[in-house]
């Protein structure tokens, strides 16, 4: 078991510089969202003496280093206010769909849209006995299994095509955001977008000409269904699997949507944004 390490302020500052340079070169509207982990809110449930890293100061320092013209989402503040609800999985190292929805409301406003209110959605549990990496490591039944949820907009149903470009440059296509086969695997969280891939292009029935580039890690995946309600096309670039961006003419806005730890991976940002 590896002890949690403090976030590198130097690495966060270097990543902020790279994002600032990308903004200066593209002059596109950009929003940055750093997602804190669950330990920030539930440390009182840890055994005595168990170490954890408080991420709030590092997120503040990171945001302060980002250009004032780039919009930032205070996901920490939003999730702290919702911390009595089911916003993080118990057995997966990710937030839940409800956690993602809570932050989506702020993200989409910063991108110029009105968020879809919660009462417009029907929530379905597509898997009620999901067990993630924490369960796989401990094999203990003391922790309740997780719920994998789908939010469907009753007033404006969404249809999507997802075109995935794999590492070997081959492509596959499906007529849904969701990969139902993943529900039967050891990582049912991959239901939301499927296995990580360098590029996924989401094409929707929202015929408004709006196109978004999302630079992401796996934490972003369960927010994409909410974002897709507002865009005709979304380009999803996985920071851990891609070093190439779509042509700048293909999108009008950029969203950085990653777990806070991911923003310390300066080399990955440099490879993607400065080559």
Model-derived features with residue positions:
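Extracellular glycan-modifying ectodomains
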Residues: 1-275
């Amino acid at each position: 078991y590896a002890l949690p390490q403090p976030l590198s302020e130097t690495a966060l500052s270097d990543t902020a510089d790279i994002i600032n340079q990308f903004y200066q070169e593209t002059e596109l509207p950009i929003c940055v969202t750093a997602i804190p982990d669950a330990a920030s809110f539930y440390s009182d449930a840890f055994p005595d003496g168990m170490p954890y890293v408080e991420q709030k100061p590092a997120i503040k320092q990171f945001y302060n280093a980002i250009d004032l013209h780039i919009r930032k989402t205070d996901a920490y503040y939003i999730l702290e206010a919702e911390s009595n609800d089911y916003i993080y999985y118990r057995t997966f190292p990710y937030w839940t769909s409800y956690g993602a929805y809570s932050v989506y409301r702020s993200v989409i406003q910063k991108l110029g849209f009105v968020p879809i209110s919660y009462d417009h959605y029907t929530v379905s549990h597509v898997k009620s006995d999901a067990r993630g990496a924490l369960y796989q490591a401990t094999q203990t039944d003391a922790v309740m299994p997780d719920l994998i949820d789908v939010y469907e907009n009753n007033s404006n149903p969404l249809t999507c095509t997802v075109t995935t470009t794999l590492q070997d440059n081959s492509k596959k296509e499906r007529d849904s955001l969701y990969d139902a086969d993943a529900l039967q695997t050891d990582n049912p969280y991959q239901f939301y977008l499927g296995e990580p891939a360098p590029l996924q292009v989401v094409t929707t029935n929202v015929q408004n000409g709006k196109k978004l580039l999302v630079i992401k890690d796996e934490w972003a995946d369960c927010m994409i269904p909410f974002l897709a309600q507002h865009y005709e096309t979304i380009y999803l670039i996985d920071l851990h699997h891609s070093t190439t961006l779509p042509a700048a003419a293909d999108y009008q806005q950029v969203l950085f949507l990653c777990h806070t730890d991911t923003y310390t991976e300066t080399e990955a940002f440099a490879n993607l944004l400065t080559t």
